[in-house]
């Protein structure tokens, strides 16, 4: 029996030794490959993709080449204003600009929107501000984030420029009404506070990012520059580090830090910080084998580790959650995964006001990632640093990484706790994983990019209506609850001069829609049946493949068959995942293996720009859902400062 046990131990040790020996050989081989070999491989790869693209353009029809060239220029835009100009060109090519001008859609109740718009317009014109206050607070639906379905994602996937112009003008009227009420001295601050309580709050969730965590910086910059950044933010792992950066600095300081290469220059000037993170001489060539070994065994690329050290040294220092909240007024949360359930899993200025932010970041990253001795620290009444948990429990508590943590129930989820504490009912999720971008079901993907089947050039044949019919229709519509004169004022002006596609010029005459009593371009969302079936079949198959892939990975993880690297790439914490959430995901074009492995310093501005560009297509949806909320925040903040 003893010999059998010894043979079993030997047979179990041999594969492990063989595996370690093979890995050492691979790492040593990669370390000794000259740098010019990698440069030659990069040149060969660039040449290959260049000629492949040339061949594809040669085979495509000329009209398709024009379309793809317009889409390609979107990726070359450096500012949001440039992106909007190019997006308007794409909308003209696809006919989406005409779709925006048409009120009709099955996705929202446009009749209810027109009715509320008409009532609000009349009350503001007649200066009946008491009635407007009632519409905002008690009798009206203006303080609903998704009133009549105007927040449906499908309304934001047709046009790159945004949604229906009717929805945009409706929200503009609400904002104008709030400004007018704010200027009225008889309107108390409590009125705006009740409106805000009814509407709810938005939170930004920064999920993970051990490899692409710097992407979160670009998402924050993109939202800040458009004044769409929520005041509540939550993060785990690398997202906790970025959330701490946001919470400790004012918005103006953040804009300055994330502009140009300011962040990179601060890091470059600290030679001690660079050396402690393994950079040494900036001109020194980094050994590829050593970098891959760090990436696999420690789970963080070198540039991400450098940023974590920078935040701890320059930003959070020895500050606590309450101290930071008193300075900036921002609510930032850090999610941790302790093995002891008596320890809170959501840390902020309410639940753990005296906890050191630095220790919270280390616990969110996980025990043994940054330091072996990971524990929560806090300040006592004498301003001395001591363990947050008692000594006996502190020795036993371990903090798990997000991929190794057991998924809590809905009642124990930190995001449920976030909703309870701060009335959060709208989430923006930043998912720093480019390789999962095609598999994210609730990501905002524009159909003109993911599919070429939706073109708004096919209109039903309707006979033109002469002027007598127009006057007759307008007289009949004047007897309806919605006055014809009011609705005529509602006809939206296009943001750009619409250029109908050539195939629709002869069919795009103006007709009268009896329900509205105003001229409208004669087209709907009805596409040719074959195109529509093909698109929906493709979308359904993709959703099925996504759910099947996620299910299989979770089963393998529960059985313990996934290695640590695969778990780090695929398995993560359960963040809010529903049809109402907005997910911002890096594009697959942003995925660069050489940048991940080498971890060069220029990765920081690269990922900031990549994250900022990824937010641009989602800004229209974010503005629709959050514009009224942010206006109320501004009004309340201004009144309190008086």
UniProtKB/Swiss-Prot annotation:
Disruption phenotype: A double deletion of TGL3 and TGL4, the 2 major TGA lipases, leads to fat yeast, rendering growing cells unable to degrade triglycerides.
Gene this protein is translated from: TGL3
Chain spans, region Disordered: 471-502
Regulation acting on activity, per entry: Loses its lipolytic activity in cells lacking nonpolar lipids.
Protein name in the entry: Triacylglycerol lipase 3
InterPro entries tied to this protein: Acyl_Trfase/lysoPLipase (IPR016035), NTE (IPR050301), PNPLA_dom (IPR002641), Triacylglycerol_lipase_N (IPR021771)
Effect of substituting residue 237 to A: Abolishes TAG lipolytic activity
Record motif HXXXXD acyltransferase motif, residues: 298-303
Occurrences of domain PNPLA (ranges): 204-392
One cellular component term from this protein's GO annotations in UniProt: lipid droplet
Enzyme Commission no: 3.1.1.3
Miscellaneous: Present with 3210 molecules/cell in log phase SD medium.
GO terms for biological process, alphabetical: cell budding; lipid metabolic process; triglyceride catabolic process
MF-aspect GO terms: lysophosphatidylethanolamine acyltransferase activity; triacylglycerol lipase activity
Swiss-Prot/TrEMBL catalytic activity: a triacylglycerol + H2O = a diacylglycerol + a fatty acid + H(+); 1,2,3-tri-(9Z-octadecenoyl)-glycerol + H2O = di-(9Z)-octadecenoylglycerol + (9Z)-octadecenoate + H(+); di-(9Z)-octadecenoylglycerol + H2O = (9Z-octadecenoyl)-glycerol + (9Z)-octadecenoate + H(+); a 1-acyl-sn-glycero-3-phosphoethanolamine + (9Z)-octadecenoyl-CoA = 1-acyl-2-(9Z)-octadecenoyl-sn-glycero-3-phosphoethanolamine + CoA
Purpose: Lipid particle-localized triacylglycerol (TAG) lipase. The lipid droplet/particle is a lipid storage compartment which serves as a depot of energy and building blocks for membrane lipid biosynthesis. Involved in the mobilization of the non-polar storage lipids triacylglycerols (TAGs) from lipid particles by hydrolysis of TAGs, releasing and supplying specific fatty acids to the appropriate metabolic pathways. Also catalyzes the acylation of lysophosphatidic acid (LPA). Important for efficient sporulation, but rather through its acyltransferase than lipase activity.
Motif GXSXG: positions: 235-239
Keywords: Hydrolase, Lipid degradation, Lipid droplet, Lipid metabolism
PANTHER family, A to Z: NEUROPATHY TARGET ESTERASE/SWISS CHEESE D.MELANOGASTER (PTHR14226), TRIACYLGLYCEROL LIPASE 3 (PTHR14226:SF44)
Cellular compartment(s): Lipid droplet
Composition skew (Polar residues), residue ranges: 471-481
Active-site residues, record numbering mapped to chain: 237, 403
């Amino acid at each position: 029996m003893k010999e059998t046990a010894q043979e079993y131990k030997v047979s179990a040790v041999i594969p492990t030794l063989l595996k370690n020996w093979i890995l050492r050989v691979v790492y040593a081989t990669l370390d000794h490959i000259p740098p010019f070999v990698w440069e030659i491989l990069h040149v060969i790869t660039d040449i290959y993709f260049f000629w492949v693209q040339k061949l594809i353009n040669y085979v495509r029809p000329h009209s398709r080449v024009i379309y793809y060239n317009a889409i390609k220029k979107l990726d070359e835009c450096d500012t949001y204003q440039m992106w909007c100009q190019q997006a308007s060109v794409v909308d003209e090519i696809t006919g989406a600009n005409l779709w925006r001008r048409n009120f009709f859609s099955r996705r929202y109740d446009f009749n209810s929107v027109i009715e509320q718009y008409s009532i609000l317009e009349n009350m503001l014109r007649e200066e009946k501000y008491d009635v407007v206050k009632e519409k905002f607070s008690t009798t009206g639906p203006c303080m609903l984030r998704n009133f009549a379905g105007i927040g449906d994602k499908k309304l934001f996937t047709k046009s790159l420029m945004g949604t229906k112009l009717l929805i945009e003008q409706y929200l503009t009227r609400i904002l104008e009404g709030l400004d007018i009420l704010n200027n009225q001295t008889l309107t108390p601050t409590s009125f705006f506070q009740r409106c805000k309580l009814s509407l709810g709050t938005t939170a930004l969730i920064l999920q993970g990012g051990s490899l692409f965590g710097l992407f979160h910086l670009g998402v924050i910059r993109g939202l800040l520059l458009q004044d769409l950044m929520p005041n509540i933010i939550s993060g785990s792992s690398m997202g906790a580090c970025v959330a701490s950066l946001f919470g400790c600095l004012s918005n103006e300081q953040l804009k300055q830090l994330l502009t140009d290469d300011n962040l990179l220059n601060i890091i470059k000037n600290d030679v001690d910080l660079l050396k402690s993170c393994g950079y040494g001489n900036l001109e020194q060539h980094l050994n590829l084998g050593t970098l891959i070994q760090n990436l696999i065994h420690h789970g963080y690329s070198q540039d991400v580790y450098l940023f974590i050290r920078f935040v701890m040294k320059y930003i959070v220092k020895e500050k606590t959650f309450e101290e930071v909240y008193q300075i900036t007024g921002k609510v930032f949360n850090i999610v941790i995964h302790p093995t002891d359930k008596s320890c809170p899993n959501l840390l902020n200025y309410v639940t753990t006001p005296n906890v050191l932010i630095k220790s919270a970041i280390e616990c969110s990253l996980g025990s043994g990632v940054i330091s072996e001795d990971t524990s929560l620290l806090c300040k006592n009444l004498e301003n001395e640093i001591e363990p947050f948990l008692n000594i006996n429990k502190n020795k036993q508590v371990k903090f798990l990484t997000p991929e190794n943590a057991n998924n809590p129930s809905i009642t124990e989820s930190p995001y449920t706790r976030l909703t309870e504490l701060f009335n959060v009912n709208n989430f923006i999720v930043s998912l720093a994983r480019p390789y999962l971008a095609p598999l994210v079901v609730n990501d905002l993907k524009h159909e003109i990019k993911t599919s070429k089947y939706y073109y708004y050039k096919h209109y039903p044949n309707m006979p033109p209506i002469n002027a007598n019919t127009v006057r007759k229709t307008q007289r009949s519509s004047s007897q309806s609850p919605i006055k014809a004169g009011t609705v005529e004022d509602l006809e939206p002006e296009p943001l750009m001069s619409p250029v109908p596609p050539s195939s629709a010029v002869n069919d795009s005459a103006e007709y009268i829609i009896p329900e509205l009593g105003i001229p409208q371009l004669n087209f709907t969302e009805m596409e040719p049946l074959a195109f529509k079936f093909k698109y929906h079949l493709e979308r359904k198959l993709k959703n099925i493949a996504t759910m099947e892939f996620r299910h299989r990975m979770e089963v393998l993880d529960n059985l313990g068959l996934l290695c640590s690297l695969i778990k780090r790439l695929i398995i993560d914490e359960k963040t809010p995942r529903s049809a109402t959430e907005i997910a911002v995901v890096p594009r697959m074009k942003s995925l660069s293996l050489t940048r991940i492995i080498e971890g060069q310093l220029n990765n920081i501005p690269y990922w900031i720009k990549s994250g900022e560009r990824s937010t641009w297509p989602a800004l229209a949806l974010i503005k629709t859902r959050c514009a009224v909320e942010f206006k109320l925040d501004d009004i309340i903040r201004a009144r309190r400062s008086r």
